[in-house]
Design a protein with these regions (language model features):
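Short hydrophobic/Thr-rich beta-strand motif most characteristic of the beta2 strand and flanking loop
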Residues: 29-36, 44
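Acidic catalytic/metal-coordinating carboxylates
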Residues: 36-40, 51, 63-69
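Charged docking surfaces used in two-component/phosphorelay signaling
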Residues: 19-27
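Non-catalytic signal-transmission and effector/linker regions of two-component phosphorelay proteins
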Residues: 1-7, 108-144
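Active-site residues of response regulator receiver
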Residues: 56, 86
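Short amphipathic alpha-helix used as the core "switch/output" element in two-component signaling
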Residues: 43, 65-78
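Active-site beta3 strand of CheY-like receiver
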Residues: 48-54
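Receiver (REC) domain active-site loop signature in two-component systems and cognate sites
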Residues: 59
Length: 144
């Protein structure tokens, strides 16, 4: 069933790339929504509530790094893992980005990376859902 693995917002100005990423993720069980630039991403992110966002670096209106900046300053989206997908990807991961995927990429590499980030985000959400006292000190009982 779509979405069992996670929800991904794919942001790229190329319809071909959006479709390529979407199809590969959907084949692996992800629910996918697409946006053609950073502005559309910011409009869609609250409606769709993705577990991971993939972002192209060079897009019209609002590029990938400016979109990253806006997502990171919004408390509602600050913790969503972000993958920068770009033909001109730098070897190091820019501040605010969780991973970089260079174009062209292997579909298995994309799916594996997104899956790992979804799992990490879910573990973090489970951890944060625990009461603060439980996170700080595991329960300690004295044996009778």
């Amino acid at each position: 069933m779509p979405g069992d693995v996670g929800r991904v917002l794919v942001v790229d100005d190329s319809q071909v790339i959006r479709q390529l990423i979407k199809v590969n993720l959907e084949l692996d069980g992800f629910e996918v929504m697409t946006a053609s630039d950073g502005e559309e991403c910011l409009e869609a992110v609250h409606r769709f509530a993705p577990d991971v966002i993939t972002l192209d670096l060079a897009m019209p209106r609002l590029d990938g790094m400016r979109t990253v900046g806006r997502l990171r300053v919004d408390a509602r989206t600050a913790q969503i893992p972000l993958v920068l997908v770009s033909a001109s990807a730098a070897p190091e991961v820019p501040v605010g980005v969780d991973a970089v995927l260079a174009k062209p990429f292997e579909p298995a590499e994309l799916v594996g990376l997104v899956r790992a980030l979804c799992e990490r985000a879910r573990k973090r959400a489970v951890h944060l859902a625990k009461p603060l006292a439980e996170r700080r000190c595991p329960s300690r009982t004295l044996a009778p």
